């Protein structure tokens, strides 16, 4: 018979008592009542926060958006096909955040900051909340540095400053994305980090943009955040905030950033879909009541920081698509009222071969003129005035056949000025090139040329001045002013090239 030793038993019991740990972990859990259409209704989750991430039993993550008296409405960040009624859900205690680092440059990622370009994981030691508060009034300073787009029409008449929000608005297929990508290409060597956010676009369109940026070496300073048309509405809604969080990371590190949202109409549609499925009451055009706040809290994050915070900046170029030129629809009017100006692209101008198809008459920049360099101000004022007068005269001249000589001259000048604003895609011009181009047009040097010869002459003139009158560009880049000396170099160059050009054309 086995002898039972009481001292051994008491030792074991004592050890067990000493090892006993009374730590209690409280997990906030709930049960799935209903799931479908990217929405789940959860019973329980009593302590959940608005916007908190929740995790389903099979691994899908969701965001708690509707906190109701008897259930919680959760939007899913995935298809959620494996979620079953009655399965458990636990709150994570975290608000949506993404990892951020310099390693994201040159990469294509999704709204959760996971790479989708097949080039491996991205290392990051820091993280930022996707929805962080915008800088306050004291944290900002007024816009004073220019952000050059490389497009004459914009940089001369609708200038953009670093820290500004400028809307690009127009119908489909009017070149909105082209204006945005040209602006990214023009930031080469300007020490500006670019973030391009594609929301609900065709995957082929996004691939095209990425390829054109790679070919021209622009991906080195660019991050692409893409949620294509087949992505869940939740991720399309989150993508712009992810892009803003990445741009903010660089802005607070005393760098300049440019962010493009292409386009916010699709984000609003994704948000409308989520809201209607969550049974939130619909308003105008069936959008929920807080669709203005959706865009205002995003665009207010663009800022020019004060000198105490390092003078970093975040310039936002949101894109909005209109239906047959209707700028008075709900989303366009909302975004126009939030931004500091808009660039209006017209389908009629586009079809008439005027590209970029910018309607200068109704495009405006509310703060950018403070950021223009002096040399550009000197030449752009005259250009604006002459184009405005030309537009007015052109409308009148359609009704009248016998025009006096002065009117005919003014119309001829206007047609040539319109011609000099035309630019090929992916061919941005430097400020110096823009100044020489505008000066040539406004001072009548193009009046003797046929309209068809204008662009050919300007291309040759820019090359000629670059090689034979480099002093002009040096003076402009160092003084930022069109000095008398610079003007004399420019006049000489134009006269010489004009004589050469006319001689060669006659042969």
From Swiss-Prot:
It catalyses: ATP + H2O + 4 H(+)(in) = ADP + phosphate + 5 H(+)(out). InterPro entries: ATP_synth_asu-like_sf, ATP_synth_asu_C, ATP_synth_asu_C_sf, ATP_synth_F1_a_nt-bd_dom, ATP_synth_F1_asu, ATPase_a/bsu_AS, ATPase_F1/V1/A1_a/bsu_N, ATPase_F1/V1/A1_a/bsu_N_sf. The record marks 363 as: Required for activity. PROSITE patterns: ATPASE_ALPHA_BETA. The keyword Transferase does not apply. Keywords: ATP synthesis, ATP-binding, CF(1), Chloroplast, Hydrogen ion transport, Ion transport, Membrane, Nucleotide-binding, Phosphoprotein, Plastid, Thylakoid, Translocase, Transport. GO terms for cellular component: chloroplast thylakoid membrane; proton-transporting ATP synthase complex. One of its GO terms (molecular function) is proton-transporting ATP synthase activity, rotational mechanism. Its main location: plastid. SUPFAM superfamilies: C-terminal domain of alpha and beta subunits of F1 ATP synthase, N-terminal domain of alpha and beta subunits of F1 ATP synthase, P-loop containing nucleoside triphosphate hydrolases. The modification Phosphothreonine is found at residue 257. It is found in: Plastid, Chloroplast thylakoid membrane. ATP binds at residues 170-177. It is an enzyme of class 7 (translocase). It is a peripheral membrane protein. Its EC number is 7.1.2.2. Produces ATP from ADP in the presence of a proton gradient across the membrane. The alpha chain is a regulatory subunit. Belongs to the ATPase alpha/beta chains family. This is ATP synthase subunit alpha, chloroplastic. It comes from Draba nemorosa. The gene is atpA.
């Amino acid at each position: 018979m086995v002898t039972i030793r009481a001292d051994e038993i008491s030792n074991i019991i004592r050890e067990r008592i000493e090892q006993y740990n009374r730590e209690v972990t409280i997990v906030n859990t709930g049960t799935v009542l209903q799931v479908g259409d990217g929405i789940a209704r959860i019973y329980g989750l009593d302590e959940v926060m608005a916007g908190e991430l929740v995790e389903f039993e099979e691994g899908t993550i969701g965001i708690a958006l509707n906190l109701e008296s008897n259930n919680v409405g959760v939007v899913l960040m995935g298809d959620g096909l494996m979620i079953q009624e009655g399965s458990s859900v636990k709150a994570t205690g975290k608000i949506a955040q993404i990892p951020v680092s310099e390693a994201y440059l040159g990469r294509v990622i999704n709204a959760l900051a996971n790479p989708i370009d097949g080039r491996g994981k991205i290392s990051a030691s820091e993280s930022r909340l996707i929805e962080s508060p915008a800088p306050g009034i004291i944290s900002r300073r007024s816009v004073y540095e220019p952000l050059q787009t490389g497009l004459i029409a914009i940089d001369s008449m609708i200038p953009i400053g670093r820290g500004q929000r400028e809307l690009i608005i127009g119908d489909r297929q009017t070149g909105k994305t082209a204006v945005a990508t040209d602006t990214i290409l023009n930031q080469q060597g300007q020490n500006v980090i670019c973030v391009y956010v594609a929301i609900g676009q065709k995957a082929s369109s996004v691939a095209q943009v990425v390829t054109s940026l790679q070919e021209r070496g622009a991906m080195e300073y660019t991050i692409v955040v893409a949620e294509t048309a087949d992505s869940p509405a939740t991720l399309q809604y989150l993508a712009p905030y992810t892009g803003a969080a990445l741009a903010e990371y660089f802005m607070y590190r005393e760098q300049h950033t440019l962010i493009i949202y292409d386009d916010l109409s699709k984000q609003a549609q994704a948000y409308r879909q989520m809201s209607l499925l969550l049974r939130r009451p619909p308003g105008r055009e069936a959008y929920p009541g807080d669709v203005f706040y959706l865009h205002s809290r995003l665009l207010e994050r663009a800022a020019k920081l004060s000198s105490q915070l390092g003078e970093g900046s975040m310039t936002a170029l949101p894109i909005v698509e209109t239906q047959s030129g209707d700028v008075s629809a709900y989303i366009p009017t909302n975004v126009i009222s939030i931004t500091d100006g808009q660039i209006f692209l017209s389908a009629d101008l586009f079809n008439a071969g005027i590209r970029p198809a910018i309607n200068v008459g109704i495009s405006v920049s509310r703060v950018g003129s403070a950021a223009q360099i002096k040399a550009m101000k000197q030449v752009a004022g005259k250009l604006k005035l002459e184009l405005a007068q030309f537009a007015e005269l052109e409308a009148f001249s359609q009704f009248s056949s016998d025009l006096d000589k002065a009117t005919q001259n003014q119309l001829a000048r206007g047609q040539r000025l319109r011609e000099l604003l035309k630019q090929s895609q992916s061919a941005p011009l430097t400020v110096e090139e823009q100044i020489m181009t505008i000066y040539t047009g406004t001072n009548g040097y193009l009046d003797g040329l046929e309209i068809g010869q204008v662009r050919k002459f300007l291309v040759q003139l820019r090359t000629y001045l670059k090689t034979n009158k480099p002093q002009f560009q040096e003076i402009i880049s160092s003084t930022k002013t069109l000095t008398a000396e610079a003007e004399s170099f420019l006049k000489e160059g134009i006269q010489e090239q004009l004589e050469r050009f006319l001689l060669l054309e006659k042969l």
